[in-house]
Every structure is written in C-alpha cells, then in structure tokens.
Design a protein with these regions (language model features):
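Single conserved hydrophobic/aromatic residue that forms the stacking wall/gate
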Residues: 1-9, 13-15, 207-214
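H-loop/switch region of ABC-family ATPase nucleotide-binding domains
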Residues: 157-158
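A short, surface-exposed alpha-helical micro-motif characterized by mixed small hydrophobic
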Residues: 163-165
Length: 214
C-alpha cells in the first residue's frame, strides 16, 4: 500500500467477504508484521512508525498489572501523571487506574488498547474494528481522537459515523479483489461506478466457482 499524497491519510478497509472477515484481519496482521504474506511485498517509509489495534486483544491482558502499570510499559515517559492523562482521554478516571487488567470488561480493554495507540507516538495507526464493545460515549471520544490525529490511519469499522467523518479513502475487499477509491464513505456508497465494480467482481467469482456437470 502506498499513499502518495499527504492528504490521503485516513483509509478505511471494508470487507465484503460475507460472514468471513478473515481477509481484512489477515491484511492488518501482515502490515503490522505479525504474519508473512504468501506472495507480494510491502514497504513502510523510513520516517514511519506503526502501532496496531488487533481485533482480538486477549493476549494483551494476560497479566496481573494494574491499568497504569500496563500502559506505562508502552509509554516513552514513565511519569504516572503523564500516563494517567492518556487514560483520562479514554474515560478512565481516578481509581480506575489501579484495576487489574485481567478483570477488565471488553469495553475497558478496548479503551486501554486505544490509550496504548495514543501514548505510543506512532504516526501510522492500524485499527481492526476498534468500536467493538464500546458504548456511545466511548465511540464519540474515539471518533474525536481519530479526527484530530495528524498521521495516517488505516482502519476497519462498522460504525458509519466514524467511517464517514474520518476516512477520505475507501478500500473494499470484494471476494479477494481490491477496490480502492479516494472519496468519503457516503460518496462511495452512492457511486454507480463503485457499484458496477462490486457487481463485476462478485459475478466473476461466481463463474470461477461454477462446476459443470460431466
């Protein structure tokens, strides 16, 4: 993936493989270095630093650390007040910081992961379904943070508001084919050209899987 223009910074990846969402998750795992591609290659720019929000964060919280201790390990600044400031942006207040990460709810774990992204200082953020388990207040806080983020965002989300207000480039995976368009989400959905491409890719795959009688 190569973003040529500095203005093309927020990309949303939309998966149309149906109930199998593995395709986009595999793409994120490849881009984050967690998985090697079967073929092809990609290269990050020399000045980029990346941070990844996985769809499954279970392994991240298999410890007895408190929230503050857990986040401090990812912070370039180890001052507790500094770390608590990032937690506060994701609606963790006061005594929340001494909770053990092992017992956090799904929504609290997501907010911890988002705090980790922010505190990392990375200029490329990759987020795979970041709104899962979040309530409306947390989704609004996330949306505001993504809008203000000055770097590159590559994300997937089912939340229409976040995609519409944040993304200026839509990449859609249709049965293994990639549609790539610099546009807002609503314009993408209303585009006859994009609808034709989705139809052509879907029909092509249907013919590919057609078995003739012998």
């Amino acid at each position: 993936l190569h973003v040529r223009s500095r203005r093309q910074r927020q990309m949303c990846i939309r998966d149309r493989v149906g109930p199998n969402e593995r395709a986009k998750t595999v793409l994120f795992q490849i881009l984050s270095g967690q998985m090697e591609p079967d073929e092809g290659s990609y290269k990050w720019g020399l000045t980029t630093t990346q941070s990844y929000f996985p769809k499954d964060n279970t392994a991240e919280f298999d410890s007895d650390d408190t929230i503050v201790d857990w986040l401090t390990q990812y912070s370039p600044e180890k001052d507790v007040t500094y770390v608590r400031g990032f937690l506060g942006r994701m609606l963790f207040a006061g005594e929340d910081g001494v909770k053990k990460v092992r017992v956090l709810s799904g929504g609290e774990k997501v907010r911890c992961m988002l705090s980790k992204l922010m505190i990392s200082g990375a200029n490329v953020l990759m987020l795979d379904e970041p709104t899962d388990h979040l309530d409306m207040e947390s989704i609004t806080a996330l949306n505001n943070g993504l809008i203000k983020f000055p770097g590159v965002l590559i994300f997937s989300s089912r939340d229409h508001q976040i995609v519409q207000t944040t993304a200026n480039r839509i990449m859609e995976i249709v049965n293994g084919k990639l549609i790539d368009k610099i546009t807002t989400y609503d314009e993408y959905l209303e585009s006859d050209e994009m609808a034709r491409k989705r139809f052509v890719f879907s029909v092509a795959v249907s013919y590919t899987h057609l078995t003739l009688p012998t």
